[in-house]
Amino acid sequence: MPANYDFTDKRILVTGASQGIGKEICLSLAKAGAQVIAFARNEANLLSLVKETTSLRYTIIPIVGDVSANEEVLFKLIVPHFPIHGLVNNAGIATNHAIGQITQQSIDRTFAVNVRGPILIAQLVARNFVDRQIKGSIVNISSQAAIRPLDNHTVYCASKAALDMVTRCLANELGSQNIRVNSVNPTVVMTDMGRDNWSDPDKKKKMLDRMPIKRFAEVDEVVNAVLFLLSDNASMTTGSTLPVDGGFSNN
């Protein structure tokens, strides 16, 4: 179960919000009193998410869009929802190609979603923090793949390593204005997609053999890390990359 946090009257933008980790972050924030702005491409899933929160103080506000859109489009989609007090850059894609099979299209798409989008959205939100003197928090959802290499994941690993450096650079630039920026770096997470992708026993064993804690992460374990970093409980934490990986990155 997610830990108890109070985000009453806070407005939090979450990308990649229509399924998996992003959806559960939205629901947990809404239950903790936040006004959640849920950004994703899948309109049907977003509307379903809104229905799940109709009994709460705030319903979730959906934004249908793609984080890889250009800066002008992102501005038009996001800025009307200011002020925002927190951002979770959760949207991301994974590519699985061995060297010799990687395409330029795969590289461009992966970096557009996993790096360029988070930078542009963080920049918009940070301007909102500064203009309104908000002590805001940004959490980027990265991966254990930013810290340790994974076979056949060169493009994905490179994109998440780049995102971790974005976290550190933003933390360095924005800290003097009381804006915190951190990353959460999970292992495989037991979403529906995670269960499907890691159902093969041999594939699963190969990964678990590298982990001191011999299991994959539950969604709540990632959500708890995100809510902690968004909250005032983490008021002295910035520039961190927080592994939720059962010790994978320690080996």
UniProtKB/Swiss-Prot annotation:
Disruption phenotype: Reduced life span and impaired egg-laying function resulting in the retention of eggs. Exogenous addition of serotonin, which triggers vulval muscle contraction, or imipranine, a serotonin uptake inhibitor, rescues the ability to lay eggs, showing that the morphology of the vulva muscles and HSN neurons is normal. The gene is dhs-21. Belongs to the short-chain dehydrogenases/reductases (SDR) family. GO terms for cellular component: plasma membrane. Homotetramer. Substrate binds at residue 143. Its EC number is 1.1.1.10. Strongly inhibited by 10% dimethyl sulfoxide. It is an enzyme of class 1 (oxidoreductase). Gene3D superfamilies: NAD(P)-binding Rossmann-like Domain. Keywords: Carbohydrate metabolism, Cell membrane, Membrane, NADP, Oxidoreductase, Xylose metabolism. NADP(+) binds at residues 13-42, 160. GO terms for molecular function: carbonyl reductase (NADPH) activity; catalytic activity; L-xylulose reductase (NADPH) activity. Its main location: membrane. This is L-xylulose reductase. It is found in: Cell membrane. InterPro entries: L-xylulose/Carbonyl_redctase (IPR051737), NAD(P)-bd_dom_sf (IPR036291), Sc_DH/Rdtase_CS (IPR020904), SDR_fam (IPR002347). The keyword Cell membrane applies. GO terms for biological process: D-xylose metabolic process; glucose metabolic process; xylulose catabolic process; xylulose metabolic process. It comes from Caenorhabditis elegans. PROSITE patterns: ADH_SHORT (PS00061). Catalyzes the NADPH-dependent reduction of L-xylulose, D-xylulose, L-(+) erythrulose, D-erythrose, D-threose, L-ribulose, 1,4-dibromo-2,3-butanedione and 2,3-heptanedione. Also active against isatin, 9,10-phenanthrenequinone, menadione, 2,3-hexaenadione and 3,4-hexahenadione. No activity observed when tested using NADH rather than NADPH.
